[in-house]
From Swiss-Prot:
Sequence similarity: Belongs to the UPF0283 family.
The entry's keywords: Cell inner membrane, Cell membrane, Membrane, Transmembrane, Transmembrane helix
Topology relative to the membrane: Multi-pass membrane protein
Subcellular location, principal: membrane
Gene Ontology, cellular component aspect: plasma membrane
Record-annotated membrane-spanning stretches: 71-91, 97-117, 211-231
Subcellular location field: Cell inner membrane
NCBIfam families: hyp_HI0043
Identification of the protein by name: UPF0283 membrane protein PBPRA2435
PANTHER family noted in UniProt: UPF0283 MEMBRANE PROTEIN YCJF
Keyword check for Cell membrane: yes
Record-linked Pfam families: DUF697
KW Transmembrane (keyword) present: yes
Biological source species: Photobacterium profundum (strain SS9)
Amino acid sequence: MSESFQNKAFKTKIVFDEAKPTDSDAELTAQVQFAESNTFLPEVKADDDIEEQLSHTLASKTKKRSSWFKGLLIAGAAMTGWQTVDYVVSAYQTGDWLALGWSVIVAGIATMGITALGRELFKLRRLKQRQTEREQAQVLLDADGIGQGKAFCMKLAKLSDIRDEHAGYDRWVQSLAATHNDREVLELYDQMVLSHQDRLSRQLVAKYSSEAAVMVAMSPLAVADMLLVAWRNFKLIEQVSVVYGVELGYWSRIKLVKLVLANMAFAGATEVIADTGMDMLSMDLAGRVSTRVAQGVGVGLLTGRLGLKAITLMRPLPWQPDQQPKLSEIRRDLLLKLTHKNESSKNN
């Protein structure tokens, strides 16, 4: 009796075991872990790969267009010359002296036009040759060979009109040794000879940027200022090319401007974001002083970026690591100069 009572009073122990995970629970857990460990962002290629693909695409398109354009020009010049000679001979045989006189005038004008066109094509070819030289220099730097660097640099010096009396060039020649490989030869040429041209071109960019910023900040005629700044930007690109020994014609100047703009448009995303952020900060700081000063800073920074890209395209050698000029070098000078100009104008 007592045993049955004890069995009824004390119930059997119930063990609450943890439920074993089922297949559906495993799937839900896997989905939660997948959602936490992934950010669902698309895979992005490196900026260098994108820029390289774009440069190859632009180069191929330019090569196809230039071949067709050259063929048409040669055919047109040949047909013009043939028709002119035939017209002069026919006029002389028939005794039509008036037609002969006009044909001589037309032939003279055609000769002048063909000569000018040939000169433009030569300058355009020189601009393309500079791009080829930079690619060859990159190949020599990557190959790290021996025996080709000195001849290549001497060729660059000759094309850039650098004479033996040049102090940096003479020092570079005296510094060369038989143990130097091509990479070291090109780096020495960059440091001793090309650095002088880089310094002159940077001074030009700083000068034109500050002048453009001051013109926009101080003048009330916005349209006239922008036209003048556009002309000054063309002048800046031309003078930078002269510093590096490349003479530009009309079409080569247009070609260089297109290359500069394309280079700016295809710049790496990190560089663009950094520069844009600093530009907006600079314009915000300048805007606290004056709206015109902020506009001047914006135009000056645009001119500076244009000039720096022109330097990159005109250099016969690619930039060494941590050597490429930054827009921050111009930004501070612009702010200081425009702020000083604004304060002096208010005092007057």
